[in-house]
Amino acid sequence: MPAIVLIGAQWGDEGKGKATDLLGGRLQWVVRYQGGNNAGHTVVLPNGDKFALHLIPSGILTPGVRNVIGNGVVVDPGVLLDELAGLEARDVDTSGLLLSADAHLIMPYHVAIDKVTERFLGNKKIGTTGRGIGPCYQDKVARVGVRVADVLDEKILTQKVEAALEFKNQVLVKIYNRRALDPQQVVDEVLGQAESFAHRIADTRLQLNEALERGETVLLEGSQGTLLDVDHGTYPYVTSSNPTSGGAAVGSGIGPNKISTVLGILKCYTTRVGSGPFPTELFDQYGEFLAKQGGEVGVTTGRARRCGWFDAVIARYATRVNGITDYFLTKLDVLSSLERVPICVAYEIDGQRVEQMPTTQTEFHHAKPIYEEMPGWWEDISAARTFEELPANAQAYVRRLEELSGARISCIGVGPGRDQTIVRHDVLG
């Protein structure tokens, strides 16, 4: 069975954990291929148990599934160990989790620099989570990063940390007026943490490709979303990695010809956390309604999410840049009880109608949504398990989103639970 990529098609927080959990029983492997603990996903099990994960793939909650933190991920050792301990305390078997030897480690100096930089920028800040993700990726690209495998060689680790702090301590002390970090203290801290995860380090590229050769099913799970991609997102208000489908091959070591399906996750309205343009953002009672009904609070940051109507311009763009074959539409139940449900079908920019993503940052900031209104529905749809059980207006809304997005909507979420899903097409079929 070829690999499947799971992509957030908006600004993240679309409900990717629910999709992974739904497919989990038919998967052998789940791979996280980019990002770090700057994003979170929530999974609600049939018994009502809720798990919030930030670094570990959500397949960890499905017995028998092997999970991989891939080479494209940046790993905070402390967060990894805390998350493992939290899962094990709730009797989750974590023995099947592997960690790529080539993933990069978030070091204490990355976190320190990230936090003080955001404070220094003031109202010009990008809105990072302050968890060291960006600085770690900077070191990776500059070829001065610390990789997971380095914890297996104390001499190499010490050399890398000493070289890094020779420069970074200058930045912390002379620019930000902060205390210098002691290289040996940093090394000792990381080596101490490594004692608890060294047995998980592996050549995950080899293991994943061998699994595909055996006919096993591999899900490549992205974090965040298309519009946060460092290349294809609303730059500079983006993350430091590639959540789009192209990043799945690079961040896992699986060749693109092994990928057969790209499953995009779309929320039936739009949300965003942090700074940056958001054409359909609502500042009225409807925005409050979506936030309250949808429980729109960031899993990782605890920050309230900005809410707006569905943006078909963004959805079309996500379909194109990811090669999305199928969509999983989430949170349709949140829209119940609205008399009318607007859909942004295009933008007005400087008096012109624009149906594709604007080319420049300035144009996107000036974009005003052009809405098409659909009739709403009052019924509680949380018990629907077939498309035909949905109210006629809800069915019409889904079909219109499918038409505007340019890919079929194969699954529909009608509640947070694993079983609260309508499957129109089998994405693993």
UniProtKB/Swiss-Prot annotation:
Biochemical pathway: Purine metabolism; AMP biosynthesis via de novo pathway; AMP from IMP: step 1/2
List of residues binding IMP: D13, E14, G15, K16, N38, A39, G40, H41, T129, R143, Q224, T239, R303
Reaction(s) catalysed (UniProt annotation): IMP + L-aspartate + GTP = N(6)-(1,2-dicarboxyethyl)-AMP + GDP + phosphate + 2 H(+)
EC number assigned by the record: 6.3.4.4
Top-level taxonomic group: Bacteria
Entry note: cofactor: Binds 1 Mg(2+) ion per subunit.
Binding site for Mg(2+): D13, G40
GO cellular component: cytoplasm
Key words of the record: Cytoplasm, GTP-binding, Ligase, Magnesium, Metal-binding, Nucleotide-binding, Purine biosynthesis
Localization: Cytoplasm
GO MF terms held by the record: adenylosuccinate synthase activity; GTP binding; magnesium ion binding
Description of how the protein assembles with itself and partners: Homodimer.
Family that this chain belongs to: Belongs to the adenylosuccinate synthetase family.
Database matches in HAMAP family: Adenylosucc_synth
Record's protein name: Adenylosuccinate synthetase
Organism: Nocardia farcinica (strain IFM 10152)
Source lineage: Bacteria, Bacillati, Actinomycetota, Actinomycetes, Mycobacteriales
